Structures are given as structure tokens and as C-alpha cells.
């Protein structure tokens, strides 16, 4: 079996890691051994946070809807229940966007929800 010289593959692997670690602080962007750890950890955080991002945005939408609903004299849960009873199918993302950018339309939705609750 012939000898395998690994210079080319090792250099390529090092370059890939160092490119990914570009912009990191101190040794994390300069020392391969430390950069490998930093890049691996960054990947773990990215994987975790891609899932958390979905939860956090939903929380934000609900907080915005709740605030706008309370300004119109209704709690979030009663608003959602009223919209369901009025068979208005609108998701929380769009509902929060309406609450922030179009107060009149949101007020109209709240009134329909209130009417459906009675």
C-alpha cells in the first residue's frame, strides 16, 4: 500500500474551518484548534436557534395581538375564541401585522369577535 500524503486535504479542511471562523474574536479566528471548537459550537447554536426563532416570533405576535386587543377592551384569548366562533380564519402573523399597521381594520375584527362571543 502506497504512502498517502495528506497535505492537500489537511490544508483544504483547515481553510474551510478558518473561513467559517472569520470575524471571531482573538484566537478563535486565528488558531485552528480553537477555531474548530468555535465553529462547532456556532453550528450547535445555529441549529438550536433556528428552532427557537419560530417560537420567539409566535410569542412576539401573540404579545402584539394581546396589547392591541386590550386597547379595544378584549383579552387575547377571548379575541381568538371570538374570531374562531365568527369563522374568521386569520393566522397570528397576519393578525399582529394588522394590529401594528392598520388599527381600523383590527378594530373591525375585534368588533366581529365581540359580536360572535355574545
Swiss-Prot record:
The record ties this protein, via PROSITE patterns, to: RIBOSOMAL_L20
Give the molecular function GO annotations: rRNA binding; structural constituent of ribosome
Q: Where is it found, in Gene Ontology cellular component terms?
A: ribonucleoprotein complex; ribosome
Kindly list the biological process annotations in GO that this record carries. ribosomal large subunit assembly; translation
Q: Which CDD domains match?
A: Ribosomal_L20
Q: Which InterPro entries match?
A: Ribosomal_bL20, RIBOSOMAL_L20_CS, Ribosomal_protein_bL20_C
* Record key words, sorted: Ribonucleoprotein, Ribosomal protein, RNA-binding, rRNA-binding
The free-text function statement in the UniProt record for this protein reads:
Binds directly to 23S ribosomal RNA and is necessary for the in vitro assembly process of the 50S ribosomal subunit. It is not involved in the protein synthesizing functions of that subunit.
Q: Fetch the HAMAP family from UniProt.
A: Ribosomal_bL20 (MF_00382)
Q: Which family does it belong to?
A: Belongs to the bacterial ribosomal protein bL20 family.
Recorded hits in NCBIfam families, A to Z, give: rplT_bact (TIGR01032)
Q: What is this protein called?
A: Large ribosomal subunit protein bL20
Provide the taxonomic classification. Answer: Bacteria, Pseudomonadati, Pseudomonadota, Gammaproteobacteria, Aeromonadales
